[in-house]
Amino acid sequence: MASTVSAYKEKMKELSVLSLICSCFYSQPHPNTIYQYGDMEVKQLDKRASGQSFEVILKSPSDLSPESPVLSSPPKRKDASLEELQKRLEAAEERRKTQEAQVLKQLAERREHEREVLHKALEENNNFSRLAEEKLNYKMELSKEIREAHLAALRERLREKELHAAEVRRNKEQREEMSG
């Protein structure tokens, strides 16, 4: 479109110069003078003291058929023989089978990858669970040992207090016997 507009502007410049030159040679232009420039047709409508008026008609691209190649249907092939058709069908079937095998292979690879990922996730989960259980068991054993040691210390102190209390009672009884 831009090229058409620029071509139009160029033609209009050429037309004004041409009109000026023609007006020098011919004082009166022919009525309904038609000028053709490539893809444009120019008709002179009016000539006045204030200027001239023109009608510019742009041809459609379909009218330019001699200059541009005509788009036609592709050249027809000669009739293919039965053997050629059979070969083409076999080749198409082979391509289809190859493509189907490739798709199945990709699906199998994807499933295998999913299986591997799932197996790895389960293995990591089992390892985590086992480590967490071992850590918990260790903490429980440690807590149990600390508790038993604390209870043993309490029992030892209680036994010592009882021994001390028994000694104090014996001493008191001996004093009472001696004094009384």
Swiss-Prot record:
Changes after translation: N-terminal palmitoylation promotes specific anchoring to the cytosolic leaflet of Golgi membranes and subsequent vesicular trafficking along dendrites and axons. Neuronal Stathmins are substrates for palmitoyltransferases ZDHHC3, ZDHHC7 and ZDHHC15.
Modified positions (Phosphoserine) in chain numbering: 50, 60, 65, 68, 72-73, 81
Lineage top rank: taxon: Eukaryota
Tissue-wise expression: Neuron specific.
Keyword Coiled coil recorded: yes
Keywords, ordered alphabetically: Cell projection, Coiled coil, Cytoplasm, Golgi apparatus, Lipoprotein, Palmitate, Phosphoprotein
Intracellular or extracellular location(s): Golgi apparatus; Cell projection, Growth cone; Cell projection, Axon; Cytoplasm, Cytosol
GO MF annotation, one: protein domain specific binding
UniProt xrefs under SUPFAM superfamilies: Stathmin
S-palmitoyl cysteine-type lipidated residues: 22, 24
Compositionally biased intervals (Low complexity): 60-74
SLD domain segment(s): 38-180
Any GO BP annotation: negative regulation of neuron projection development
Main subcellular localisation: Golgi
Coiled-coil regions, chain positions: 75-179
A GO cellular component annotation in the UniProt record: growth cone
Coiled coil recorded as keyword: yes
Pfam family, one: Stathmin
Location of the region described as Disordered in the Swiss-Prot/TrEMBL record: 60-81
PROSITE patterns recorded: STATHMIN_1, STATHMIN_2, STATHMIN_3
UniProt record similarity statement: Belongs to the stathmin family.
Subunit structure: Interacts with STAT3. Interacts with CLU (secreted form); this interaction may act as an important modulator during neuronal differentiation.
PANTHER family: STATHMIN (PTHR10104), STATHMIN-3 (PTHR10104:SF17)
Function according to Swiss-Prot or TrEMBL: Exhibits microtubule-destabilizing activity, which is antagonized by STAT3.
Name assigned to this protein: Stathmin-3
Phylogenetic classification of the source organism: Eukaryota, Metazoa, Chordata, Craniata, Vertebrata
